[in-house]
Amino acid sequence: DYYASRGLGDVYKRQVYKKPKLMNNVPMHYCPGCSHGVVHKLVAEVIEEMGMEDKTVGVCPVGCSVFAYRYLDIDWSEAAHGRAPAVATAIKRVWPDRLVFTYQGDGDMACIGSAETLHALNRGEHITMIFINNAIYGMTGGQMAPTTLIGQKTVTCPYGRDPKIHGWNLNITELASHLKGTRYVTRQSVDTVASIRQAKKAIRKAFEANMAGKGSCLIEIVATCNTGWKLSPVKANEWMRENMFKEYIKGDMKDTLDQEIPEL
């Protein structure tokens, strides 16, 4: 062909991207432009690269990620709303050689499951919690979430979140960073190529720490909900950068993985 005749065949036929093998070839129920699909891919890639395909258990609760088990070909356990950390704790304690993680939204982790979240982290359970923060209840129609920004409009606060009425937005990741059981707490995003690469590094770091028995890890992904926000995917990313990143500042909040856990 044209390229082969010019000695360029190998260059143009080289594979530069492929779908992770753990990603099932099925349509996703997520809205087009949503951040969930990208994060799913990163989780699948990290599990494959670690060679943990047959030794990983994910826990997905109620929320947009309720059907996560359809998309990643690993073992999954469904949990009641907010109870993913409790279920993950049990699985990890029974199977300490397994990589165990939860995949939760802001309503599940920071509202109905805040007790399970904070106590599992404070105990230092050897699990990773992946927290998708899009500041809204996406699955149920766009209601106010614990992480909804001050002034942000939702169907349950149509005039904007007012701290005098609705209280302040909850920064549960920052709160988690002060718990003695947490070893690695970070906030990332997946809105650019660079941020996607950084988020993947964070996921790998947390998973490896859990397998080494180094305590609890929490990875917040500041995400978009273009349907709930009533914006196009492009505009949603712009809004996130202009508003979410000011309140939920990206970066590592805690990293004590190089320190030994005190012996009793």
Predicted regions and their residues:
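Glycine-rich beta-alpha junction loops
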Residues: 62-64, 134-136, 192, 221-228
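Active-site diphosphate/adenylate-binding microenvironment
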Residues: 19-80
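Active-site-proximal loop->helix
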Residues: 114-119, 139-153
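Single conserved hydrophobic/aromatic residue that forms the stacking wall/gate
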Residues: 1-12
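Conserved thiamine diphosphate
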Residues: 18, 145-212
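Short, hinge-like loop/turn segments at secondary-structure boundaries
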Residues: 74-77, 120, 145-149, 235-238
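Thiamine diphosphate
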Residues: 62-138, 201-205
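Flexible, low-complexity linker and terminal segments
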Residues: 10-16, 20, 25, 211-264
